Amino acid sequence: MRTNFTNRIYYSPLGNGGSKVIPVLRIFDYSKAIEFYIDWLGFKVEWEHHFEENTPVYMEVTKGDISFHLSEHHGDGTPGTHVFIWCNGVEAYHTELINKKYKYNRPGIEETFYGALAFTVNDPFNNKISFNEKLPDKKEGS
């Protein structure tokens, strides 16, 4: 365990359930981000921050254990980022999204060469998010 003596925060070792990665994705338009992440993908806004009125937003959105930080700030994140997520329920989630008939995204779903069922969505800011679920191992001869 590592100790930060400046503020006495204790960190869990990597891989022992105390770690979480949260990608920072660059956005350029708050309304389009809400339409995509909240209205279509079904995430919820955990919090938003502005340094003052009429300044760029920095916010966290979540769906289950998945979190993204979305930032309008110049220099935060790089447009064109690709986030790869292992999760469960990919087929049902894909069906839910397709049934919403979002005009700007109709992702296909596929079995991948690495043994997953997967689909990828593209946000309005050129970021890609791939949702992947491990398929059961195929038995020899089946």
Q: Which role fits each region the language model picked out?
A:
Residues 1-34, 46, 81-83, 134-142:
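N-terminal beta-strand motif that seeds the catalytic metal site of vicinal oxygen chelate
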Residues 3-6, 29-31, 83-128:
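Vicinal oxygen chelate
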Residues 17-18, 24-67:
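Core segments of cupin and vicinal oxygen chelate
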Residues 44-47, 70, 105-108:
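A short linear hydrophobic-aromatic micro-motif
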Residues 52-57, 77-79, 112-117:
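Short acidic/glycine-enriched loop/turn segments that link adjacent beta-strands
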Residues 64-68, 75-77, 89-92:
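Short, charged/polar surface micro-motifs in flexible loops or helix N-caps
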Residues 69-71, 120, 130:
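Conserved beta-strand in the GNAT
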